[in-house]
Each structure stands twice: as structure tokens, then as C-alpha cells.
Design a protein with these regions (language model features):
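Soluble extracytoplasmic regions of secretory-pathway and membrane proteins
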Residues: 1-420, 424-446, 451, 457
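Long, low-complexity, intrinsically disordered segments
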Residues: 452-472
Length: 472
């Protein structure tokens, strides 16, 4: 990676010995690399001297390792590289990398058109850095910037041609923006930008109801949900930050990577809604899922209270809270069709050790009114599902054919409950299927024993007949 987020210095490629340090293979051996890309400037001594003065590094001119074949790679920070070409866009601070079909590493940098003069629109203020604030009431993710991590090639694409600001820039700089669509092997890997999602989430807390009187009175204001991380007061909690997770939505046939954030009614703790930001067919999609007002879906703080009141779980967590350590948690709520799955990993961190890395110790999961804990996610989910497999009334068929039909039906029910992420029915269906299989094994064994007895009796009878005939 020659162009990235932390590549802030100039480098020289194809130096006198050509080989570059790549990574250590052992304590005494290093892997080496030779740059074969097209990026870089081939400069003579005077040009290198001028560049060295500008950059404050005269080694560019006087180093014995720099020769006529050397190339100098400059402006390697991808955000600064984009700003140099197009300074009139607002750039996301968290670009991400994808791999195209050719195996090349490509940075995807989201760019935004903004304005503070859109009529009748709520203003918001962004803290861009310690000293810089940006006030705006219009923002659109209308431009994607693709940067090759190896050779620095950069392309600007307009992804929303209904944005008048973006289209105005295209007319001003017609050669800057690439024509045509973004290659599908790249666009299929787009994710919803968290920077934009945070702005939208803040606005959605107030502007989500289309009824003017409700909006005017402020009767239906939301808060972003909070949770107990173990680092602050358990009464106030910490505001949940958006997180990426695989989501199953009602209108989708397959899981998708989406940004998720739950909301609660103003100054209350139960979940009233959640938003999911996904990319579908190369376009961003933000969906609000709202529960009925009387649904009373548990919020993270309420669930933490239930966890503390669960004797088995609280004892396991307390056993981790030894002197010199700190217990931290991070709740994730995963939408699964028409239900929510709560996942809370529990970490142990040593307080007095420098650079202490939190270690995963337990995972707590919940769905509906059921809680479970395990050493990892798989074990916790198994424990959760097993709680639902109770009080099952089973009518056992009394012959093999009927049992086989019942097993096929039970397996179909299990597939359906699994696809619907219905943990209660999954537990019951698993138990039902296991009972039927056990019953089939027992019935087959009984029939085999009965068959063996019949064969044995026939052999004895035939032997007696033969013996009698011989005696006669």
C-alpha cells in the first residue's frame, strides 16, 4: 500500500539497490519488494533539490541511493490527494478498502456536497476538527472517489445525478468526473457511510413524523438509545454509536451488511424504533423500522437491569471482576426479520498494565424475555435456544412410515423457524425433531428384535422337524 491514510511522507522507489523492506519473515530475515507501478516523479538533481527545500528533506537531492531511475512518490495521503484535485467537496474521514476482480486494492472515499442555504431546512453543526466547525442544512453523498492503493490513480464518480450542486461541478470541471458507471465489482461492495448516518440519525430523532401538528408540538421526539459499558454511571449510560452488522429485514430475502442504531422515546428506555442503512443495487437506502407504541420492546438499559437481576449471569460476571481488572461491555442489537437479538460481549481488562488489550471472557444474548450466557457467541446462542425447548407435547406415531413423515414435517418446521429467526420456535422444533428421531431409533430396534426372534424360532422349529425326520 503506497497510498493510504497514514502515508504522509514522500518516498523514493527504485533506489540504487531497488529492493524495499516489506515485512519480517524471521528475526534475521526480511521479505523484500520492488515497486513496479507507474506512480512517481522522475526528477533531475535541481528538481530534487527544490522539492527537498519545499519538503524540508534535502536527502531527496543528496542521498547516494537516489539515481536517475528513481521515482519520488508525493501527496500519498488519499484524503489530501482528493482535496488537492477537488477542494470544494466535504470528504469522509473514514474511507474503506475493497478488492476488485483484478485483485487490486481500491480505496473508496465518500464525498459530500453541502450547503447552508437550503430554504426551510433544519441546520446542524459539524465539528470537523478541534478548531473547525461547519454549519449546514443540506448534505448529499453524491460523489464517490476511487483511489488505487498501489499506483495512486484517482477517479471521481457522480452517483446521484439529481444533485444540482454535483451536476454544477461536473459542468465546471467536465474532465474531472469519470463517465459511465462505477465498475460493478467495486460498487457491489459499497457500505452506508457512517458520517452521513450520524447526521441523519440526529435529525431523525425529531423529524420522523409526517403529521404537522405532532411535529409542531414535539409530541413524538426520540433519543438515541444508551447502554451500560461499565465505564460510566449505570444510571445514565453511554449513547450507542452506529455499528455495522449483518441484518435480516422483512422485505429482503438475504442478509445484508447494514448500519444499525436503536432509538427510544424521549427520556424513556424502551426501544421505539431503529434505522438500518444499507446499499442496494449500488444506491444507499435508509429505512426506519418503528414498533407499535404499546409494544414495550426492551431497551439496552432495561436489559442490563434484567442481566443484573439474573443470579446465574451476575455471578459469572462478578467472578471476572477481580482486583486489578475492569469489566467492560458493548451491546449490539441485531434485527432479525420481526424480532431483535441482543448480543453483549463481556471483556476483562487489566487496569495497571500498559497497552492492556481487553480480552473476551463471556457473551450474553437475549431475545424476548429469555437470557443466556456462554463463553462465546455460539455457546450463548445454544443456551438461549435450549431455554425455549420446554413444555413440548409430542404425539408419537406408532409405526416407522408415520414417524418418517413426522420427521420430514418437523425438519421443514425447523427450517422455517430458522429462516424467520424465531428462537422460541427453533428451540421447540429442535426438541421435537430430536424426540421423533429417538422414537424412530427405538421403534426400529424393537422391530429388529422382533424379527430376530421370529427367525430364531423358525430355525429352531425347522431343526426339530429335520431331527424328527432323521429319527423316523
Amino acid at each position: 500500500i503506497y497510498f493510504g491514510l497514514q502515508t504522509n511522507n514522500n518516498i523514493v522507489t527504485n533506489s540504487k539497490n531497488r529492493s524495499e523492506f516489506d515485512y519480517p519473515v524471521s528475526s534475521t530475515e526480511n521479505a523484500e519488494n520492488v515497486y513496479e507501478g507507474d506512480a512517481g516523479l522522475s526528477l533531475n538533481f535541481i528538481d530534487r533539490f527544490i522539492l527537498g527545500i519545499k519538503e524540508g528533506d534535502l536527502n531527496l537531492a543528496f542521498s547516494a541511493n537516489v539515481n536517475s531511475d528513481s521515482k519520488i512518490l508525493t501527496n500519498r495521503n488519499i484524503i489530501e490527494r482528493a482535496k488537492t484535485l477537488m477542494p470544494y467537496l466535504l470528504y469522509d474521514e473514514e474511507p474503506y478498502m475493497v478488492v476488485n476482480d483484478a485483485g487490486e486494492l481500491i480505496w473508496v472515499l465518500d464525498a459530500y456536497t453541502t450547503s447552508n442555504n437550503y430554504p426551510y431546512s433544519q441546520k446542524t453543526t459539524l465539528q470537523l476538527d478541534t478548531l473547525t466547525k461547519l454549519e449546514l442544512n443540506y448534505i448529499r453523498n453524491s460523489v464517490k472517489v476511487l483511489i488505487n492503493a498501489y499506483n495512486g490513480d484517482i477517479s471521481f464518480y457522480i452517483t446521484d445525478e439529481t444533485d444540482p450542486i454535483a451536476m454544477a461541478y461536473k459542468k465546471i470541471y467536465p474532465d474531472l468526473f469519470a463517465e459511465g458507471n462505477i465498475p460493478s465489482d467495486i460498487s457491489s461492495q459499497f457500505i452506508y457511510p457512517e458520517f452521513l448516518y450520524n447526521i441523519q440519525s440526529d435529525i431523525i430523532t425529531r423529524y420522523h413524523d409526517i403529521q404537522p401538528d405532532v411535529l409542531y408540538r414535539g409530541d413524538d421526539v426520540w433519543d438515541i438509545a444508551t447502554h451500560n459499558t461499565g465505564r460510566v454511571s449505570t444510571k445514565t449510560g453511554t449513547t450507542i454509536e452506529p455499528y455495522y452488522t449483518m441484518v435480516d429485514t422483512i422485505e429482503s430475502d438475504e442478509s445484508k451488511l447494514g448500519l444499525v442504531l436503536p432509538f427510544t422515546p424521549n427520556e424513556k428506555q424502551n426501544i421505539i424504533s431503529y434505522t438500518v442503512g444499507t446499499y442496494e443495487n449500488g444506491q444507499p437506502k435508509l429505512t426506519i423500522y418503528k414498533f407499535e407504541a404499546d409494544s414495550n420492546i426492551l431497551g439496552p438499559m432495561q436489559l442490563d437491569t434484567q442481566i443484573e437481576q439474573d443470579e446465574e449471569i451476575s455471578n459469572e460476571i462478578e467472578a471476572l471482576n477481580v482486583t486489578g481488572t475492569r469489566i467492560t461491555k458493548n451491546m449490539i442489537i441485531v434485527p432479525l426479520n420481526n424480532t431483535l437479538l441482543y448480543i453483549e460481549p463481556v471483556y476483562q481488562e487489566y487496569i495497571n498494565e500498559e497497552d492492556s488489550v481487553p480480552t473476551l471472557k463471556k457473551v450474553i444474548v437475549a431475545s424476548g424475555n429469555k437470557l443466556a450466557i456462554g463463553n462465546d457467541l455460539e455457546e450463548a446462542l445454544q443456551n438461549l435456544v435450549s431455554q425455549y425447548a420446554v413444555n413440548i407435547e409430542v404425539e408419537n406415531p406408532d409405526n416407522v412410515d408415520d414417524l418418517i413423515d413426522a420427521i420430514i414435517k418437523a425438519n421443514g418446521n425447523l427450517k422455517e423457524s430458522t429462516s424467520n429467526s424465531d428462537f422460541e420456535m427453533m428451540g421447540k422444533d429442535i426438541q421435537r425433531l430430536q424426540d421423533l428421531i429417538d422414537r424412530l431409533e427405538k421403534l426400529v430396534e424393537e422391530e429388529n428384535n422382533e424379527t430376530n426372534n421370529i427367525i430364531s424360532n423358525e430355525i429352531v422349529n425347522n431343526t426339530n422337524v429335520i431331527a424328527n425326520e432323521v429319527l423316523d
